[in-house]
Amino acid sequence: FQSNGISYPYQGFDEILAVGVKRIFSPNEKDRFEALSAFHQNKWLFGYLGYDLKNDTEKLSSNNADHVLFPEISFFEPQHLLFFKGNEIEIWSEEDVLEQIDKTESDLTQSKLNQPQASINKAEYIGIIEKLRQHIEDGDCYEINFCQEFHGEIENVNPIQLYSDLNKLSPSPFSCFQKHHEHYILSA
């Protein structure tokens, strides 16, 4: 988690690097929030909640194409925690990780992003926007948040460098990089 030094009215969070996996939580059963609560055990957990979990909490459903194939919920308990506070680093670990950090080699691979594909074409997008604009004009709503997914392939991906580049382009107070098996979440 990285705050990029951006102040936030409610303090935000420390910059934290969570490394390694002691335990992973990725359930398939229906009562996932209760299972997550039992898994927590007052330990540090990092992860995410997917958009479609709304269907578990309310009588809602969506039939969106899933191009990323992430589980709807996943959390892990890290082996090592590194807290960055100004010019200091505090390490919480059950083992000495400094030697491992010193031996780590940098990956200097440059990523090549192929042309991303929109989940809907331009004509459909314009049609949806016109319908949403009409709802606003009719007074049905005063604000609408419309999103569309873009997906694509990245060759020779260096996800850490890509995250760093995105973060430099658009720093935010709640930036995050997460690896989930062979998938990555870059939230910058």
Predicted segments, located by residue:
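Extended alpha-helical targeting/anchoring segments
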Residues: 1-188
